[in-house]
From Swiss-Prot:
Probably deamidates glutamine residues to glutamate on methyl-accepting chemotaxis receptors (MCPs), playing an important role in chemotaxis. Keywords: Chemotaxis, Hydrolase. This is Probable chemoreceptor glutamine deamidase CheD. It holds the Pfam family CheD. GO terms for molecular function: protein-glutamine glutaminase activity. Coiled coil: none annotated. It comes from Rhizobium rhizogenes (strain K84 / ATCC BAA-868) (Agrobacterium radiobacter). The gene is cheD. InterPro entries: CheD-like_sf, Chemorcpt_Glu_NH3ase_CheD, Cytotoxic_necrot_fac-like_cat.
């Protein structure tokens, strides 16, 4: 068993995903209405986490939006990243966290995020072995991708509001790709 003091911590922020095969690494994130899906293949000894802001894309990915904030994109990236590291789809298992209702509005984005993640995993045939979603407070999540161990800490009201402020900040748009071709 890896001592927590010796574990190397890798922080996952909104719009990111990481795939790890090192038992001494713990992935960590802070969630409000966002959701983190933690997937692993226990036989291959590889796992990962993503952190998404919204469930799906309202418009085409070619419309110039930042696809990394959407669950549909990050779920595919995480699964493909695991497969590239030797995982097999039929051995994947998932844990899902987040999706709190952090803002009093008619729309509950957190609930939509959590429902999206659960439906996506169900559609892909990936069993959810554990989940902690919903509520009114954010959470800090730690996930050891090789062992599958996960731990969460509830955030206070003030901490949740800080997380809400971060989630509402616009994600930096990726630099435009230069489509020009230069011939030598």
């Amino acid at each position: 068993m890896i001592l927590e003091a010796t574990a190397r911590r890798v922080h996952i922020i909104q719009g990111e995903y990481k795939v790890i095969g090192d038992p001494e690494v713990v992935l960590a994130t802070i969630l409000g209405s966002c959701v983190a899906a933690c997937l692993r293949d226990p036989v291959a000894g590889v796992g990962g986490m993503n952190h998404f802001l919204l469930p799906g894309m309202a418009s085409s990915p070619t419309s110039g939006g930042d696809a990394t904030r959407y669950g549909v994109h990050l779920m595919e990236l995480l699964i493909n990243g695991l497969l590239k590291q030797g995982a097999r789809r039929d051995r994947l298992e998932a844990k899902v966290f987040g999706g709190a209702k952090t803002i009093a509005t008619f729309s509950n984005v957190g609930e939509q995020n959590a429902a999206f993640a659960m439906q996506f995993l169900r559609d892909e045939g990936i069993p959810v072995v554990s989940s902690s979603t919903g509520g009114e407070h954010g959470r800090k999540v730690e996930y050891w991708p090789v062992s599958g161990r996960a731990r969460q800490y509830p955030l206070t009201g003030a901490e949740t509001q800080k997380t809400v402020a971060l989630e509402q900040r616009p994600v930096a748009a990726p630099k435009p790709v230069d489509n020009a071709i230069e011939f030598f």
